[in-house]
Amino acid sequence: TNYMMKTILKYKSVYQVAIDNGWAQRNPFANFKFHYEQAERGYLTMDELTRVMQKAMPSKRLEHIRDVFVFSCFTGLAYCDAQALTREHIITGSNNRPWLRTHRQKTSAPVDVPLLDVPLQILAKYEGYSGNDRLLPIPANQKCNDYLKEIAAICGIEKRLTFHLARHTFATTVTLTNGVPIESVSKMLGHRSLKTTQIYAKIVNDKLAEDMTNLSTRLQHLAM
C-alpha cells in the first residue's frame, strides 16, 4: 500500500543519515523499488450533489452537516480547514467578490478560493450561529462521519460521504468538468505540485471517454 511505501521511504532516509554520520555501513533499503498505487478518488456526480443539496433533512443536526459538506464541495476545503474558518479568512478578491484566504493545515500551503453563490448562501445562513468567530457549525470529525452516513442513506447515495469526497467533488464535478483550468484548480486546492491535481484531470477524461462510448452505443442506429 502507499502507507507502507511511505514508511519504508522514511526508514531508508534514516539509514542514509546514519551512513552519512558513520553510524551504519549499509542501507538495507538502498535497492528497494518504490511503487505507489494511484489512490482512488471518489466524487459525487452533479446529479448526486444536487440530490444532497435539495433533499430536506429530518433534523437540524443533519441539516448543519449537510450544509457544511456542500460548502466543502464548492470550496475544496478539507474538514480541518473548514472547521478553522473565521471571519478574517474572508477577503475581497481581485474581482471585488468575497474570497476565502487560508492555509492548509496539512501542508501549510496557501489557499485562495473565490466564493461561488452556494457557499456564500451557506455562510449567510450561519452568520452569528456559533456565538464565536467561527463561520460554520462543525462538530468533531467522527460525529461528522456518522452523520454523513445518515445523509447518504436519506439521499439514496451508495457512495461513502466524507470530506475527502467533498474535496474530490470540488476538483472534478464543480471545477474541471466545467472548464476551470487545471492550474487554477491546483492553486485552489493548495497543491504544491500540478502532478497531484492531474489525477483529477485523468478521472474527468476517463469519465468523458465512458460517457462518449455509451453515447456511441445509443446512436449506432443513426450510422450512415
Place the predicted regions along the sequence by residue.
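Basic, Lys/Arg- and aromatic-enriched nucleic-acid-binding interface segment
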Residues: T1-L9, D20-Y79, Y129, N178
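C-terminal flanking helix
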Residues: K12-Y15, I19, V204-L208
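Catalytic-site neighborhood detector that most strongly recognizes the C-terminal catalytic loop/helix
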Residues: Y36, Y43, R104-S108, N141, ...
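C-terminal catalytic core of tyrosine-transesterase DNA break-rejoin enzymes
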Residues: V70, F74, C80, E150, ...
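Short, polar N-cap/turn motifs at the start of nucleic acid-interacting alpha helices
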Residues: H89-N96, E158-K159, G179-I199, D206, ...
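C-terminal secondary-structure termini that scaffold catalytic or DNA-interacting sites
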Residues: I138, L215-M224
